[in-house]
């Protein structure tokens, strides 16, 4: 079928993020006094901490164990295992300066997306160079990386795919991956504060790429830091959207973009703490955004008369913790901590061998007795949420579904529509699919397809109709047995991201709904950041089309949903029960509950955040008496 509106989804998000950027910029430029800036910072910090909601979790014993220690010229290194949650083991390396005469400042170095994690070459170079010159460094393996790899992806060491699988599943029952990742970092700060070798009044934070993202988030969550330096991560969300750059699950904090915040607000939240916004000129995290945030931090830091001013640094290389950045961050931290570096050049410092950095048996936390994986903890938490659910009436179920979908309060009857070129239903027949584009002032909503034997230049009118919601595109209607619609007009809806509106964004090789970095992943993530849901954006089009049919006299609809369309069909049957007389579901997916804690390729675009707090989609199907075939 024609893909006439492949850019419609992308352009909607570009417009939204540009609007939000412009509004936020005006608010920032209006901050002229220290009091105004600090009040803005206070409110940003409050909202961010509410969203991450980590203070509710108990600070259980860390139970740290040193499993190995090595001495090198200029520094020593300890291999450590600690528990950020009971039985949830974190593997770490602590680098300490040689010839210590007392507690020293420390840097918590958060790892980016590298399978070697705490053992990656550039990161280790930063760690040994910093420790040799007088400041300790603690670096740990994130979940699914290094010694904490999760063996659940068909033996494929795809750490980003593992992160994104966990990320989409957490949303179903009300958690999110940025908070999940931040918890390990907060507990690592706890660990540093317990160490007699560390001056707990002088803890600093850095990380590159995904570690730079986590540095940005944790900066707003942690009061015990004296300086932060996110690397190769900070930009403007507008730039990410404009550049069609899908980002990782930990880079998608829910709601905040829609509330007018941006990445910079996680840095502003800690003012007057000094921040170095670091990056590289040829970075896929747009350097224009990095530098604009850096200038913004310089301006606000000056307004509040910060003792050490925030600033930014841009290296000449592609995305990575390159040498110039390492040196700039290191110099920034020595200034912030008041430590005089010992003048030892990074090139002259020996690096540990790979096996010398392993903390767990054979470098695998799953060989530690009693280890609990992230998947196990997720499943336990999800089950607890499900067990706490209350029975809901059909009307109550409709209300919570609207809430999770983030639907607007009222979806009006479309005032107009466009008549599109015809499509021949089956080659060799005279059956014609008439196509109509329904839109509102914000965006294109859906393409309504109508199978008739003639060219209909207006949406055909009928009292009874069959409505088909496809898995991928309405061309699937060609395979639908005639018995489903005989004697009635068969309508089909290509809603947002479906059929005529399948995205052509984010590269030609990334258009499968289950891709970890495809267009569907990208737009689902942006929806979450805006406080919306991609299924909600899709449902708005479906419900608008039904309103149009109802206004033209349609009274009864038999609804047929296939594959992912079965889920949307279930939502439709509940929210348009005044029209939907019968619901038939073909090739229906599994329950959402069954996804949690498993490897799966269910599309992020089909994930409905928070729904498992109230019901599963199969519970809704039961409530509308859906027929499964």
Residue locations for each model-derived region?
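Alpha/beta-hydrolase-fold serine-hydrolase catalytic core, especially in secreted/extracellular enzymes
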Residues: 1-89, 102, 119, 271, ...
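Cap/lid segment of the alpha/beta-hydrolase catalytic domain
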Residues: 101-186, 191-194, 234-246, 250-252, ...
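Alpha-helix capping and helix-loop boundary segments enriched in small/acidic/polar residues
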Residues: 114-125, 157-161, 172-183, 205-216, ...
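Short hydrophobic alpha-helical runs that function as membrane-insertion/retention elements
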Residues: 137-141, 226, 276-279, 490-493, ...
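Alpha/beta-hydrolase-fold catalytic nucleophile elbow
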Residues: 141, 206, 231-232, 278, ...
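Primarily recognizes the serine-hydrolase "nucleophile elbow" in alpha/beta-hydrolase
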Residues: 188-259, 545-614, 619, 623
């Amino acid at each position: 079928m024609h893909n006439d509106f492949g850019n419609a989804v992308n352009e909607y998000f570009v417009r939204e993020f540009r609007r939000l950027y412009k509004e936020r910029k005006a608010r920032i430029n209006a901050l002229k006094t220290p009091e105004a800036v600090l009040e803005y910072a206070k409110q940003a910090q409050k909202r961010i901490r509410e969203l991450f909601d980590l203070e509710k979790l108990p600070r259980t014993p860390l139970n740290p164990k040193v499993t190995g220690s090595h001495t090198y010229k200029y520094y020593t290194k300890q291999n450590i295992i600690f528990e950020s949650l009971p039985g949830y083991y974190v593997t770490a390396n602590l680098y300490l300066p040689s010839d210590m005469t007392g507690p020293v400042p420390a840097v918590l170095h958060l790892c980016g997306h590298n399978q070697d994690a705490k053992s990656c070459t550039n990161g280790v170079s930063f760690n040994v160079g910093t420790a040799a010159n007088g400041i300790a460094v603690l670096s740990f393996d994130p979940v699914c990386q290094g010694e904490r790899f999760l063996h659940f992806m068909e033996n494929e060491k795809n750490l980003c795919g593992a992160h994104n699988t966990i990320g989409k599943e957490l949303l179903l029952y009300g958690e999110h991956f940025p908070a999940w990742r931040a918890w390990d970092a907060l507990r690592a700060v706890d660990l540093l504060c317990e160490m007699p070798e560390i001056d707990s009044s002088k803890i600093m934070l850095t990380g590159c790429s995904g570690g730079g993202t986590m540095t940005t988030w944790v900066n707003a969550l942690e009061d015990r830091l004296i300086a932060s330096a996110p690397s190769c991560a900070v930009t403007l969300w507008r730039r990410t959207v404009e550049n069609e750059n899908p980002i990782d699950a930990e880079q998608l904090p829910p709601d905040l973009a829609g509330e007018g915040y941006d990445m910079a607000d996680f840095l502003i939240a800690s003012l007057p703490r000094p921040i170095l916004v670091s990056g590289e000129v040829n970075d896929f995290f747009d350097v224009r955004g990095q530098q604009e945030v850096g200038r913004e931090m310089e301006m606000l830091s000056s307004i509040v008369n910060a003792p050490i001013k925030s600033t930014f640094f841009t290296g000449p290389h592609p995305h990575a913790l390159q040498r110039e950045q390492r040196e700039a961050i290191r110099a920034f931290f020595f200034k912030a901590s008041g430590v005089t570096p010992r003048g030892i050049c990074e090139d002259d410092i020996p690096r540990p061998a790979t096996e010398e950095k392993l903390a767990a048996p054979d470098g695998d936390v799953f060989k530690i007795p009693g280890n609990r994986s992230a998947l196990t903890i997720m499943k336990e938490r999800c089950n607890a949420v499900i067990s706490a659910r209350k029975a809901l009436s059909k009307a109550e179920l409709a209300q919570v579904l609207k809430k999770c979908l983030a639907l607007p309060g009222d979806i009006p009857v479309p005032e107009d529509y466009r008549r599109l070129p015809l499509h021949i239903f089956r080659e060799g027949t005279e059956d014609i699919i008439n196509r109509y584009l329904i839109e509102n002032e914000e965006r294109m909503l859906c393409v309504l397809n109508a199978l008739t034997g003639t060219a209909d230049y207006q949406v055909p009118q009928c009292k009874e109709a069959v409505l088909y919601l496809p898995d991928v595109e309405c061309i699937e209607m060609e395979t639908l047995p005639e018995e489903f619609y005989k004697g009635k007009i068969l309508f089909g809806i290509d809603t947002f991201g479906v059929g005529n509106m399948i995205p052509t964004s984010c590269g030609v090789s990334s258009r499968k709904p289950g891709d970890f970095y495809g267009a569907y992943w990208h737009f689902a993530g942006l929806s979450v950041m805006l406080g919306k849901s991609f299924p909600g954006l899709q449902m708005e089009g479906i419900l608008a089309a039904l309103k149009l049919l109802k206004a033209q006299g349609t009274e009864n609809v038999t609804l047929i949903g296939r594959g992912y369309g079965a889920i949307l069909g279930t939502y439709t049957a509940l929210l348009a029960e005044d029209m939907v007389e019968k619901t038939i579901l073909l090739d229906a997916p599994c329950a959402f509950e069954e996804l949690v804690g498993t490897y799966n390729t269910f599309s992020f675009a089909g994930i409905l955040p928070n729904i498992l707090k109230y019901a599963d989609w199969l519970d809704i199907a039961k409530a509308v008496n859906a027929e499964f075939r």
